[in-house]
Amino acid sequence: MSLSYLDLLLAFGCVLAVSVIVNCFLVSHNNCVIEITGEAVRISGCTFDRTFVELVKGLKPARH
């Protein structure tokens, strides 16, 4: 039995889909992400307490 490229691609897609689903269940939903780009600073998933606000209030977009 020989596998074609389409069969291999389909198998890879299935493995990738299962991996993404498993990762979604294993990863905590309380991840704090701070993304600093040239245009903006984005903060998501963080708990905004007094200490956190003091640490991040001076963040600004990266300058080139």
UniProtKB/Swiss-Prot annotation:
Main localization, broad class: host cell
Organism superkingdom: Viruses
Record keywords, A-Z: Host endoplasmic reticulum, Host membrane, Membrane, Transmembrane, Transmembrane helix, Transport, Viral movement protein
Acetylation as UniProt keyword: no
Spans within the Lumenal topological domain: 1-7
Keyword Transport among UniProt keywords: yes
More about this protein: TGBp1, TGBp2 and TGBp3 seem to act together for cell-to-cell propagation. TGBp1 is the main movement protein that physically cross the plasmodesma with the viral genome. TGBp2 and TGBp3 would facilitate TGBp1 function.
Similarity annotation: Belongs to the Tymovirales TGBp3 protein family.
Compartment(s): Host endoplasmic reticulum membrane
TM spans (from-to): 8-28
GO cellular component labels: host cell endoplasmic reticulum membrane; membrane
All ranges on the Cytoplasmic side of the membrane: 29-64
Protein name (Swiss-Prot/TrEMBL): Movement protein TGBp3
A Pfam family the protein falls into: TGBp3
Example of a GO biological process term: transport of virus in host, cell to cell
InterPro entries given in the database record: TGBp3
Role this protein plays: Plays a role in viral cell-to-cell propagation, by facilitating genome transport to neighboring plant cells through plasmosdesmata. May induce the formation of granular vesicles derived from the Endoplasmic reticulum, which align on actin filaments.
